[in-house]
Amino acid sequence: MNNSINHKFHHISRTEYQELLAVSRGDAVADYIIDNVSILDLINGGEISGPIVIKGRYIAGVGAEYADAPALQRIDARGATAVPGFIDAHLHIESSMMTPVTFETATLPRGLTTVICDPHEIVNVMGEAGFAWFARCAEQARQNQYLQVSSCVPALEGCDVNGASFTLEQMLAWRDHPQVTGLAEMMDYPGVISGQNALLDKLDAFRHLTLDGHCPGLGGKELNAYIAAGIENCHESYQLEEGRRKLQLGMSLMIREGSAARNLNALAPLINEFNSPQCMLCTDDRNPWEIAHEGHIDALIRRLIEQHNVPLHVAYRVASWSTARHFGLNHLGLLAPGKQADIVLLSDARKVTVQQVLVKGEPIDAQTLQAEESARLAQSAPPYGNTIDRQPVSASDFALQFTPGKRYRVIEVIHNELITHSRSSVYSENGFDRDDVCFIAVLERYGQRLAPACGLLGGFGLNEGALAATVSHDSHNIVVIGRSAEEMALAVNQVIQDGGGLCVVRNGQVQSHLPLPIAGLMSTDTAQSLAEQIDALKAAARECGPLPDEPFIQMAFLSLPVIPALKLTSQGLFDGEKFAFTTLEFTE
């Protein structure tokens, strides 16, 4: 917990202090006063009655003593409950397929006033230029968009081909940027545990900031060693006792509920009055359809309250104050004097019904955000340009030879989880012994001219057709799954033609596709348009079989070697438990 770095983020001049204090004392006129409001007390529980007084970006006072205070403008909350703006403790905005500007437009009106973002998706594709663009977006955003400096680009050295490197020298150039809060998820946990100097150099360089972790399922001495290296949190926990042990050992626990990785139900029972300061909420990866139809952090709070009976003040605490304290953002997370006026007014606190949002002391208007989106995106100078350096493919590129009677490794998908299982399947002249086996291939897209890496996939639910995408964590090569080589080739060629994107093929034809012109990861369309296109893609994908709820996000993690158990990268089949490549055929 890095309270010592608060000065980096809390910029207030002496003049601003004097003006704020004058309003607090009652000697000057406030900019805004919110009347007819109850403030949820995140520290003691219960509510505080009375107005909220705002001067500039900050709260000057709270409580009944300001009932008659003067203000330039008054906001009638109409009996609403006020809570601090919501904070997402860990996410990759690129996974929403929205630009940071569009993401803000989609989520700020839902109360998400702050995000802690790791832009390692775009950094894996285009290196420092991608990070620089995210920093430009953060500088101009109304939303508080903070960045963790991507630590593992690529995710695991020597295991995949990606588009760029991000050296320690480049990382250090961003360390003191005002929007940078620390070092992003250290995914190479075996390297940290074994004391690899290159990784310890990165940890040492950012040790005065927040050091993010990534250690799914880790326990025992290995977990102790990982924490001893200075890692402060983890968002990858998926089992109750795993989360409990991490809390016991001093880690902060990020409870994740994304579009593919859904860990809230497993971990929510851990949250209580005692440990809630060490618990945070995050989405990691959430697509625009879910944001539009279900929400973002607001959806997670709602579920904590309605499904897990978490007390109101605790649910909102883990959605704001706990995260602010963890990242040293001491000007955020509470509705109290001197704190930044990031305020969410709720007409129903139990249902998390957002009535109005203020950020940095100013009311947010959703229509204004939408109207300004195009100009603000252009102002950020997005890094356009085709990042697909791959020639079209043919069905013969996916040809695999199988021997009857032999056993082959199959990546077994677990719906709504990022981990996979490794299982075997026996081939005969009639095919494999289980009819859920389909084909998967990964094609590097950065000009290395490698042949496709091919494998077998089970449990995905694909009965016909093919799905292809350039969103494929973390190197973002082209991943394709299918029942026939011909349809796999058709899907791959469509995303190559689009300059990156998503595609569904069935009955020998492209049924739906979505171009992603920025790094093959993001669209420049509006959030509403993007949600509609995702809806069409999902509808087309559902015609291919009983797929996961979010088939493209689930598919995107089948190439990430730092999450067990069996994955496929552009280099081949990777055992995520042994951290070594393995063979498709079992050798006795």
UniProtKB/Swiss-Prot annotation:
CDD domains xref list: AdeC (cd01295)
Entries under InterPro entries matching the protein: Adenine_deam (IPR006679), Adenine_deam_C (IPR026912), Amidohydro-rel (IPR006680), Metal-dep_hydrolase_composite (IPR011059), Metal_Hydrolase (IPR032466)
Complex and partners: Homodimer.
Protein name in UniProt: Adenine deaminase
A GO BP entry: adenine catabolic process
One matching Pfam family: Amidohydro_1
Record-stated family: Belongs to the metallo-dependent hydrolases superfamily. Adenine deaminase family.
Species: Escherichia coli O1:K1 / APEC
